[in-house]
């Protein structure tokens, strides 16, 4: 875990820096510099692109991580890398042709509701294509155990560029329409930068020769395409369906709550960059003992780190909403439901890496397809009835079923589970800390209240976590940097 913790810590710092910039954009710059309708438009375009890009990538970013270490010669590795580069291009061209022929249908789809979206529909394809290749080249760097630069580009670069663009809009240098086009170009430039970095780590010899186990690779890519897309679909489906049932500004309002809750997932995202290829390597070498140890320790470490973030969000949410325009404020219940989803995700440790790099990914595929349909039905029923609260409830139910399914699959097939008695103690402590501080408000400015409450909660949490040794890996990291 030493290398994992070291790179994960660097990635977590980078990711939180990016999320800090994103928080300023999401909570303040977008809400004050753009009209609600255009903020909702931006949120919709990015959510729709997130639904599309996994299909363009055709799962090859996961395929690369799984199969790369199984090849022993440079020639075979180069054949795999060439396939990884060409396959998404072919799929994207096919999807582009379908998009061209169905463009008039898409325009008619938006006639009945949010017509503001119509001129920008084609940008979804460009953003999705750029994101697909960015993820492929990011995986390229991860198989070389270099994830820090890619993580910076994934979490910081585009948010920093958006900050600059928003200020250009504020100072009337850019119109809102050109801002949206410029934002699209940011994603294209990010993909190009990631490609140059990946090639600097390892540039294959280009050939049209195909890897020897082509059928296995293609079958895995096709299946993992759906299985690996489930989390993305479950995450962004609600926002896309909100746009269909409610005025588009509701996408922005709901998106703020989603972004706040997503901060909890930062430790998991940071650790995943390095733990994913390592898990694949352990599975390829059949090292079950190390795999089991990694499963438990990653779960406990992620829970310890993400739990304090969960507490800070919930106890400060009312004060935080006082800092943004009234029209963007929503029920605390929505943030709580979405935050619980993210906390549960962290508790699973490296379960996704175990499943997607094992021979049991077909089972995940089956559950994923079923749960995507269930999530669609949940949103179909709950959004018209409860509005954005219904979207949050649908996401909570869908992710709860999905995560429990993954836990049961790993328990059944690998005879291991990530939880210990410490997991229960941490959850009880977190629940008590949250309830104790949620109703305690200081009579000061919201920023001062947030700072005071955050300091008190953090100090109490760190003292208890270190005293009772919630996670040995976290304790070692704290001692190292404390010195």
Where are these regions (language model features)?
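Transmembrane helical elements of multi-pass membrane transporters/channels
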Residues: 7-23, 182-194, 198, 211-281, ...
């Amino acid at each position: 875990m030493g290398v994992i913790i070291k790179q994960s810590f660097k990635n977590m710092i980078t990711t939180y820096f990016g999320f800090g910039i994103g928080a300023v954009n999401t909570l303040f710059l977008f809400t004050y510099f753009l009209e609600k309708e255009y903020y909702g438009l931006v949120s919709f375009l990015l959510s729709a692109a997130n639904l599309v890009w996994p299909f363009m990538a055709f799962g090859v970013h996961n395929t690369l991580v799984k199969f790369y270490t199984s090849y022993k010669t440079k020639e075979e590795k180069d054949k795999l890398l060439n396939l990884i580069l060409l396959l998404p291009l072919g799929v994207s061209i096919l999807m582009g042709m379908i998009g061209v022929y169905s463009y008039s249908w898409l325009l008619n789809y938006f006639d009945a509701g949010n017509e503001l979206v119509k001129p920008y529909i084609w940008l979804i394809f460009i953003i999705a294509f750029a994101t697909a290749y960015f993820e492929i080249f990011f995986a390229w760097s991860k198989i070389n155990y270099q994830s820090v630069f890619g993580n910076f580009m994934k979490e910081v670069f585009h948010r920093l560029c958006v900050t600059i663009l928003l200020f250009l809009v504020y100072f009337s240098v850019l119109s809102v329409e050109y801002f949206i086009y410029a934002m699209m170009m940011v994603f294209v430039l990010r993909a190009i930068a990631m490609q140059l970095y990946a090639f600097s780590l390892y540039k294959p010899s280009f050939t049209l020769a195909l890897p020897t186990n082509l059928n296995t690779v293609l079958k895995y890519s096709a299946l993992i395409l759906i299985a690996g897309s489930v989390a993305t679909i479950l995450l962004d489906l609600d926002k896309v369906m909100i746009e269909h049932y409610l005025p588009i500004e509701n996408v922005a309002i709901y998106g703020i709550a989603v972004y706040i809750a997503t901060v909890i997932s930062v430790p998991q995202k940071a650790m995943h960059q390095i733990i994913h290829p390592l898990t694949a390597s352990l599975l390829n070498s059949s090292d079950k003992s190390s795999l089991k140890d990694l499963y438990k320790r990653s779960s406990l470490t992620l829970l310890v780190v993400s739990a304090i973030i969960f507490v800070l969000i919930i106890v400060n949410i009312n004060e935080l909403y006082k800092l943004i325009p009234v029209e963007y404020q929503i029920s605390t219940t929505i943030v709580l439901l979405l935050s619980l989803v993210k906390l549960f995700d962290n508790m699973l440790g490296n379960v996704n890496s175990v499943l997607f790099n094992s021979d049991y990914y077909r089972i995940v595929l089956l559950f994923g397809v079923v749960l995507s349909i269930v999530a669609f039905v949940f949103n179909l029923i709950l959004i018209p009835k409860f509005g954005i609260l219904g979207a949050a409830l649908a996401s909570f139910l869908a992710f709860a079923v999905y995560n429990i399914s993954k836990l049961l699959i790993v328990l059944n097939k690998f005879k291991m589970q990530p939880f210990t008695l410490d997991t229960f103690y941490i959850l009880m402590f977190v629940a008590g800390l949250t309830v104790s501080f949620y109703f305690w408000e200081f009579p000061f400015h919201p920023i001062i209240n947030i700072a005071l409450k955050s300091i008190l909660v953090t100090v109490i949490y760190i003292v208890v976590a270190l005293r009772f040794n919630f996670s040995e890996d976290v304790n070692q990291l704290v001692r190292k940097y404390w010195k």
